[in-house]
């Protein structure tokens, strides 16, 4: 089971814990994966204690300056990276990742992302090309390429051979038939 959502105030820790326990009671042999954003270490521990097994949290970008160009000033890459470390310390199977070709991204940023993932040694990695959305400040930016994404996937496989590389819904090449 995957429980996924944004950072929605309706879903308090108590509600999430209740959902986890209900699922575990009915399906005790199934893993529960959460993808619900940045939380406190105490919240992560409570979800784990209730029965959650895995947590997906893209690190987005390791580089502080690049992160600031993509996110509001009240968010920080250091906090997000610490969340991933906390999750691993608790005992979750952890997934991280980033977008390839995001605005302002440099080859150095990609190298830093690779080194961070090598150090974190997550169980799962999800990357995919940046796709601009018309209702965002990045609407006019170029999309990331499939070629660079595949290249980065190859490097990840060489650096972390046993990691689960999760398929991404944006991997369809524009020239493919549907």
Where are these regions (language model features)?
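Radical SAM/AdoMet-radical enzyme domain recognition
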Residues: 1-2, 13-99
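Glycine-rich, proline-tolerant flexible connector loops at the mouths of alpha/beta enzymes
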Residues: 2-13, 65-67, 129-141
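Conserved C-terminal portion of the radical SAM core fold
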Residues: 3, 27, 53-54, 59, ...
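Active-site-proximal loop/turn and secondary-structure-junction residues that shape catalytic pockets
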Residues: 7-9, 36-40, 61-63, 100-104, ...
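Charged helix-capping and loop-helix junction motifs
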Residues: 14-19, 110-114, 144-149
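Catalytic cores of alpha/beta
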Residues: 40-49, 102-118, 172-178
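Active-site-adjacent loop and "lid" segments of alpha/beta metabolic enzymes
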Residues: 143-146, 164-177
């Amino acid at each position: 089971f995957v429980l996924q959502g944004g950072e929605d105030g309706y879903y308090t820790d108590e509600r999430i814990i209740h959902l986890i326990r209900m699922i575990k009671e009915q399906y005790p042999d199934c893993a529960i994966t959460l993808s619900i954003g940045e939380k406190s270490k105490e919240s992560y521990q409570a979800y784990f204690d209730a029965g959650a097994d895995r947590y997906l949290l893209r690190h987005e970008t390791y580089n502080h300056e690049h992160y600031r160009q993509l996110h509001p000033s009240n968010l920080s890459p250091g906090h997000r990276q610490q969340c991933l470390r906390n999750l691993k310390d608790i005992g979750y199977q952890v997934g991280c990742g980033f977008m390839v070709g995001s605005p302002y991204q440099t080859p150095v940023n990609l190298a830093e992302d690779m080194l961070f993932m090598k150090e974190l040694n997550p169980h799962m990695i999800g990357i995919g090309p940046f796709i601009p959305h018309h209702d965002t400040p990045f609407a006019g930016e170029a999309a990331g390429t499939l070629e660079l994404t595949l290249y980065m996937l190859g490097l990840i496989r060489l650096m972390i051979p046993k990691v689960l590389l999760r398929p991404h819904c944006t991997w369809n090449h524009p020239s493919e038939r549907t």
